[in-house]
Amino acid sequence: MTTQNQNTHQQTVFAMVVGEHSGDTLGAGLITSLRQTHPHAKFIGIGGPKMLALGFESLFAMDELSVMGLVEVLGRIRRLLHVRKTLTDFFITNKPDVFIGIDAPDFNIGLELKLKVKGIKTVHYVSPSVWAWREKRIFKIAKATDMVLALLPFEKAFYDKHNVPCTFVGHPLADDIPMQSDKVLARDKLGLAQDKKILALMPGSRGGELSRLLEDFFESAKQLQAQDSELLFVAPMISEQRANQFNALKAELAPDLDIEIVLNQTQQVMAASDCLLTASGTVTLEAALIKRPMVICYKFSPITFFLGRRFVKLKWFSLPNLLTNKSLVPELLQKDVCPENIVPLVKERLYQDQSQLNDSFTAIHQQLKCDASKQAAKAVLDVLSSKLLSNNK
């Protein structure tokens, strides 16, 4: 890392760090919006492929930070600490005008705190789930950030209650996904039959998620197909690596099950489907915005679940339910993830009218559609302006 400090009067430097694909999407949208007012700005830190395509300079590969769960993080802790120290030293030496940590809170908030102490303005984009567990983290966030950018309205209310600066910007997915999704067109593009029911199998984007969920997903699919031989299964995968893992587990657990794998077209698969059997995460919000019924499952590693459950204060864990404050979609967690529970829930959503659910999904969409990248850029520039004002005093 020999990049020279180019923070001159002519060039504004925005430092950013993202840890996974959803953050890469947010970062790319933010870069695009910031470039409208700062066309010659420099963007540097850790970014993903979408950010790199916009000229972002990444000091480490994004995959360095793509870990989830206490056990998984502990296995990589030395490397993560090395990366964070290297970034801290780099940004203190080569001071950016503002640092924006995008999600990855356990990594970014510690980094933001070290930078803010050195006089660097910091923004955290995507609130950690402090409203759900480890609520006292909000005091560290208050010390570490000049502004939190929240994607969800109930998050801002939580920060306001604790007098921590926060701006609700809306969710970029709500801007990108059309209000009405076209099932016929999606099936045409994917070459899928128009006259059959389709269930999407979506066991997550991380290797650990696939290994913990797929056995129950495959067994549920077998039972569903035994009851409806015309039922089709499609599985969207975000990478060849995940597709290979999926195929290996399928060969072991369900060699006779016919499943169409589609790479890098998750939203298209959702739109083409009648129901989704999915892991928890941002994908459940995508499903709601595409207006598709879903059954949500999640399994933590046993140790992670044991260590974390005492800190969790949630009635629900999926975004559609949290946003509506009710059991809008079914959730299954840990031992409840089993074919005995999955099969009847999927059947109900495949074969019964879902128009009332669709109305609720539309209300969510309208609430979150705010031109998020533009709102986020405005908030970042407000923080930058406050820095310039304080420097000129």
UniProtKB/Swiss-Prot annotation:
SUPFAM superfamilies: UDP-Glycosyltransferase/glycogen phosphorylase (SSF53756). Keywords: Glycosyltransferase, Lipid A biosynthesis, Lipid biosynthesis, Lipid metabolism, Transferase. One of its GO terms (biological process) is lipid A biosynthetic process. It is an enzyme of class 2 (transferase). Disulfide bonds: none annotated. Pfam families: LpxB (PF02684). GO terms for cellular component: membrane. The keyword Glycosyltransferase applies. It comes from the Bacteria. Gene3D superfamilies: Glycogen Phosphorylase B (3.40.50.2000). InterPro entries: Glyco_trans_19 (IPR003835). Belongs to the LpxB family. Condensation of UDP-2,3-diacylglucosamine and 2,3-diacylglucosamine-1-phosphate to form lipid A disaccharide, a precursor of lipid A, a phosphorylated glycolipid that anchors the lipopolysaccharide to the outer membrane of the cell. This is Lipid-A-disaccharide synthase. The gene is lpxB.
